[in-house]
Amino acid sequence: MSVSVEKRSAWFPPDWDDDERMSFLFSAFKENRDVDCTDWDGKIDFWSPLIIEHCRRCGSVCVNLQDLNENFRRKGSVPLGLSTVIQSMIRSGKVQKESDFAANVDSGWLSWGVGLLLVRPLKWTLSALLGSGRVPLEESFVVIELVKEKAAELLAAYRGSALSARSLLSFQELRSLSSHICPDESTLCMALLQLQREKHVTVSLHEGEKLVKFSQAGQGRVSPVSEVDLGIYQLQCSEKLLEERVEALGHEAEKCKQQAKSLLKEGKKSQALRCLRGSKRVEKKADRLFAQLETVKGILDRIANSQTDRLVMQAYQAGVAALRISLKGVTVERAENLVDQIQELCDTQDEVNQTLASGAPDAGEDSEDLEEELKSLMEKSVPENDLFPAVPTHPITPPRKTDLPDAAFVQFLPSVPNPGMNITDEELDRELRRLTVSDKGLPRESVSPQRRLEPAQ
């Protein structure tokens, strides 16, 4: 995992060029954190993320102290406190020994030989027995954050490929599929171990071949490798082998035909006939293998359809169970009773509305009826000419002239009574008799100025 100086300088922090700062960071830790916690925590906070980023840049999920010392060498010096940093990362759960990481492997991993990871190095065992806190240089540690990233990328690559139609793959097929994700076989094994922890992968060994089974999309966890899985895998391998054989025989038959043409041009008719007979034999063999290939494909199609039918049946069963739960307590009698109650309430509401409508005063007649009535009124209305009297046809008699002059006639008229004056009934009777006498042509009685009625104000 050695990296060139040019690549390292591209992702190292700016403090890497500060000699004074790096002299402090390259120095050893104090024996006890309580002596100077600032010094201790400052170095841990610098080296921990740098180690993780270094592994991410290299594409690895494992790290050991020897590689770190070599890659972090600066001006001939190596960091003296990386062993303490590794121990701190172990306590915080950022890294884990390979042996501890693979502690829960199943029999499939052991059959692969991955169980060798469980054997702790002798140096580490002796160090633990002697109470030494130093980390062996060659002890490998798994960076938990990075192995989870690799596992997620591997699962996404499988589900996005054409191989996702197959649940069981050979390790070599998976190795080819993940070559751009996992640079080596060890990294791939670590990613598979993480996927196994997440219940997305299980492994097995069949007739000396390493097999990996993935969980399908929509499944919460992967199921163990069954005899059905192995049978399907063998059929798929047979299909692939037959396709390769048929293709090879096709090329061989074509080659024999071309050779027969060449010999015929050279005048070697007998040899050309032998090549042509060989071509026919190859074609017959290819046809026989092609028929076998079609049979295998038909079986695989039937298996796929049966699996689809099984999923459909499971969906039906789940649907029936859900309907049974949702319809619990619902009966036809209850439904009819509810419908009758609803109809009864609707009838009651209609009766109430009719009662309220009949008791209310007439809001008015229809607008069309009102328009008709207005039109009839207009037709029956009197014309404007009828408002004036008819023109007389005989001579008009001039008004009769009185013998009294106008001034005398005005004086002859009684004064307008003043409603504000206090006039008694006797005075009104006397005034009425006077007017009656005046109308008969008798001389009117003089009225004192005090008794004369004043005009109305």
From Swiss-Prot:
Transmembrane segments: none annotated. It is found in: Cytoplasm; Nucleus envelope. Residues 234-266, 331-382 form a coiled coil. Keywords: Coiled coil, Cytoplasm, Nucleus, Protein transport, Transport. GO terms for biological process: exit from mitosis; late endosome to vacuole transport; late endosome to vacuole transport via multivesicular body sorting pathway; nuclear membrane reassembly; protein transport; vesicle budding from membrane. Pfam families: Snf7 (PF03357), WHD_CHMP7 (PF25239). InterPro entries: Snf7_fam. GO terms for cellular component: cytoplasmic side of plasma membrane; ESCRT III complex; multivesicular body; nuclear envelope. Belongs to the SNF7 family. This is Charged multivesicular body protein 7. The gene is chmp7.
